[in-house]
Each structure stands twice: as structure tokens, then as C-alpha cells.
Amino acid sequence: MTQLLVTTTENIPGHPYEVIGEVFGLTTQSKNLVRNIGAGLKGLVGGEIKDYTKMLEESRDVAVNRLRDNASAMGADAVVMMRFDTGSISQDMQSVAAYGTAVRFITEDLTTDNA
């Protein structure tokens, strides 16, 4: 089985489609206390907080996978105009939403009636 196509563009060359509707995938992640202390110390001296960067990357992956699952359940062939939205719930919790438009490919009838 092929993986459902997710794109940030509005058009998919060679694939006309009909809109099914909006679709999204959500996740909220947090790091453990020990890592939060380490991140707090890193925040004092500056620089990238790699644990939080990794958490956000993992959160985006989870959100996109849930987006794909939800679109598939709607009967979609693809999701167009996919975007991310992120927000902090607390100092150590981050939510990520992946959202877009679920679409179904239109198969054009190429047969002609010469009768």
C-alpha cells in the first residue's frame, strides 16, 4: 500500500481532485524533569536546546502521521495545503497541529463514443 500523499502546495500536477474537507493531526508532548533541568541550565548560557528540538521534530512526525490516518479514514488520496501550528501549553509542554485539505483524485474517463 502506498503512503497517502501530503503536500504544502495547492495543486498536484497530473492529479485533478475534488475536495473532501479539512483534516488535522494533533499531539502534545513534554520532556521529563531531569531534561527540563538540563534545558533550564542551557537556557542560562544560550544556544540550542537539543532535547526540545528533538521533541518538536518527533511531535511534527506524530502530527503528520495522525493527519494521514485521519485523511485516509475520510477516503482521501492526498492532503494539500498542509501547514503546521505549534504552541506552548506550559514551560515544558508543546502542542503541534498538522492541518490541511483532504482530497480525492478524480479519474477522468478518456473513452470516447464514436457511435
Swiss-Prot record:
Q: Which InterPro entries match?
A: UPF0145_dom_sf (IPR035439), UPF0145_YbjQ-like (IPR002765)
Pfam short name (any one): YbjQ_1
Q: Which domain of life is it from?
A: Bacteria
Family (UniProt): Belongs to the UPF0145 family.
Protein name, UniProt field: UPF0145 protein lp_2083
